[in-house]
Amino acid sequence: MTSSRDNHLWLQSWRDQQTDFHQQSVNPLLARFWSGLKLARGSRVFVPLCGKSLDMIWLAAQGFHVIGVELSPIAVRDFFQENHLKPAKRRLGKFSLWQHGRISILCGDYFSLKKKDLGIIDMVYDRAALTALPEDIRRLYVAHMQVIVPDSAEVFLLTMEDAEENESLSQALGVGKEISGLYAENYLIDLTHVESAFEPASEVHNQDLQRVEYKLYRLCSKSVAS
């Protein structure tokens, strides 16, 4: 996160256990489509803004080395405790590094990450980390990713996108305008899968439903593709 206010709100949500965004199971699109990447066992997968996602357990079980980054020490602590793992801990620059088996989590601010902190990265797994950020920060998030991750690493990007007003179904099921605006200059964008759902327009009960699109993108750097 880039502002102290955003950081404070995120840390406060974990202190207050306001974490409805945390999923209690592995993302079904991950389990369904990951094998199509043909990524070699032992490859290193970066999971930005990882929270305490169970997807990291799944990835490690498939034989991958997982490197997460998470601002909240409560989230990191809970991840290891709830999965009955006893991590080793040490300082790494501005971060606290927690490690157990194939899973490493850097506890600290994503925007403080340097390439040397991550080491070699073969794939990025973004499970709605991008879309969880405030809109004015997303471009900074993408730009920083390009600095700390090598061009050779593809991005497995999961998003939840609201259908825009006056948008046709064919437009809604295509590459989102924001995704195109953020990535098209430097990446080839492959929209691999789309699922539509109707969800409450707000957290207030008895609200109208709105259509949202759950999308899976595979992003490949143009510098590698060429």
Give the positions of each predicted feature.
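Class I SAM-dependent methyltransferase "Motif I" SAM/SAH-binding loop
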Residues: 46-51, 129
